[in-house]
């Protein structure tokens, strides 16, 4: 097995990979293990964190967004340790004003929704050219290589 160069093993992880991992999907678990074992350097950003937390909160409470907003005390009883432990194995990349500017052109050029555009612009800003995702929308982005599972 050939060793990867540093730039080859830098991979951005989309929210759906982390969500599928939390749901027990084997393919996602294998990828997460590679990050844990430091075979690949995994990156996420605040968009991914927000999406994963929102999914996890809805899934564990079995409540809709509106119900949680109406009864925020529901959040007190949640155990979020498993989610934050998952986040801890990744390098968390900050968003900044330049990334926001880049996202504007990415929305237009690749016809992406804002969160996906912010993910792509994060990759572009930090010079990460690989993304791991189950989302086919990223296939439209010519500067990203989709890591197939």
Swiss-Prot record:
Alphabetized UniProt keyword annotations: Hydrolase, Magnesium, Metal-binding, Nuclease, Toxin-antitoxin system
Binding residues annotated for Mg(2+), in chain numbering: 14, 116
Start and end residues of each PINc domain: 11-149
SUPFAM superfamilies: PIN domain-like (SSF88723)
E.C. number: 3.1.-.-
Cofactors: Mg(2+)
InterPro entries per UniProt: PIN-like_dom_sf (IPR029060), PIN_dom (IPR002716), VapC_family (IPR022907)
Coiled-coil parts of chain: none
Family: Belongs to the PINc/VapC protein family.
Protein name as catalogued: Ribonuclease VapC2
Source organism per UniProt: Methanocaldococcus jannaschii (strain ATCC 43067 / DSM 2661 / JAL-1 / JCM 10045 / NBRC 100440)
